Amino acid sequence: MHEPCGGCGELLDVTNLGPFETAICPICSTETHVKREFGAYRLDQRYAIGGMSVIFVGWDTTLDRKVAIKVLNEEYCNDEIRIQAFENEGRLTAQVSHPNVVKIYALGRAYGRFYLVMELLEGLSFERIMAQRGALPEDEVLDIAIQVAAG
């Protein structure tokens, strides 16, 4: 697979590079980020890193909407057990329809990498809120507990 250099247009071999890895052009030394397209989805920025995957903020080029794209780490892309767990996560979550459960839009594979496309939830995590604010008032904690119990 080849992508053009952002500086001079030279075609760079990016076959073995993962999402957002950098290729350096041998002609002009420009750094080019590669593999931003996963089918109909474009990876725009890293959002979170987990034990088995990286989540990107992306764009659904077909439906013109922001999405979250979870990409299985490259080291697990030949591990059938991890692939199955990743795919099961997507399939099982897609069967749940609840306001407190993220919606799954697609499950796919591109460039040998497995990915899930899901609803992008924006805002602060509970962990971040606690780090910023410390102990929360009882009424807020109860509201959060009710939401957790419902979902």
Spans of features found by a protein language model:
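Protein kinase glycine-rich loop
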Residues: 44-51, 55
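Flexible N-lobe loop architecture of eukaryotic-like protein kinase catalytic domains
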Residues: 48, 88, 97-100, 113
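Non-catalytic scaffold residues of the protein kinase domain
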Residues: 52, 98-101, 126
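Glycine-rich ATP phosphate-binding loop
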Residues: 57, 65-74
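AlphaC helix of the eukaryotic protein kinase fold
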Residues: 73-95
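Activation-segment/catalytic-loop signature of the eukaryotic protein kinase fold
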Residues: 107
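Conserved short submotifs of the Hanks-type protein kinase catalytic core
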Residues: 111-125, 129
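Activation segment signature within eukaryotic-like protein kinase domains
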Residues: 144-145
